[in-house]
From Swiss-Prot:
Disulfide bonds: none annotated. Keywords: DNA-binding, Repressor, Transcription, Transcription regulation. Belongs to the NanR family. The gene is nanR. One of its GO terms (biological process) is negative regulation of DNA-templated transcription. This is HTH-type transcriptional repressor NanR. Transcriptional repressor that controls expression of the genes required for the catabolism of sialic acids.
Amino acid sequence: MDVMNAFDSQAEDSPLSIGHSLRRRPLARKKLSEMVEEELEQMIRRHEFGEGEQLPSERELMAFFNVGRPSVREALAALKRKGLVQINNGERARVSRPSADTIISELSGMAKDFLSHPGGIAHFEQLRLFFESSLVRYAAEHATDEQIALLTKALEINSQSLDDNALFIRSDVEFHRVLAEIPGNPIFMAIHVALLDWLIAARPGVADRELHEHNNLSYQQHIAIVDAIRQRDPDKADRALQTHLNSVSATWHAFGKKNQKMR
């Protein structure tokens, strides 16, 4: 393929108007870095460079595409964000396989912007409720004895962390992470981790003393969820999970309103 022919081609002039609605307007030209990125991505997807294989050096890519170093570096940085290459200091870029974490991290910026909009937190809380509702139903029907033992261990850590808010938050996240691991789907794990990260980051600041009662209630609700899973009762597990997440949502909304009144 003559890569440079594609880079140098110019669009033909279009007519002043097409039909009644389309009128001539200038087409945005792609940056050189974007064209380099697209071509390298196609090469990777065609397996011209295999997973784990190093790409040519920056100097070789500059010569091949007839572009400057900034264009090559921007293209490689974009491929890294997509999870298609790994870049370590002093080494050539190496082809990698995109992971579920990579896919979710690409959405992270947009998600955080969305959370700042009116109703954004409520929409993400609803997404979490729908998602974890399916997880606990699956767990009640399919969790192995070993997985239930891991949930029990997570409960024990919950119990030991009740008087330390920072530890309890970590143990709370760990409890829900164990739930998300039960189906064995890495995409579920990536979604779950991202959802909790986004929601926790959006929570208001709260004094430690105000969190103690909330921590104990969450712990008791975790017990109810695990009991229902042990009983292999998906409906009961679902109800316990919904009670828990609705309670968590109401508590943090109340904390947020209280903070606003104090300003």
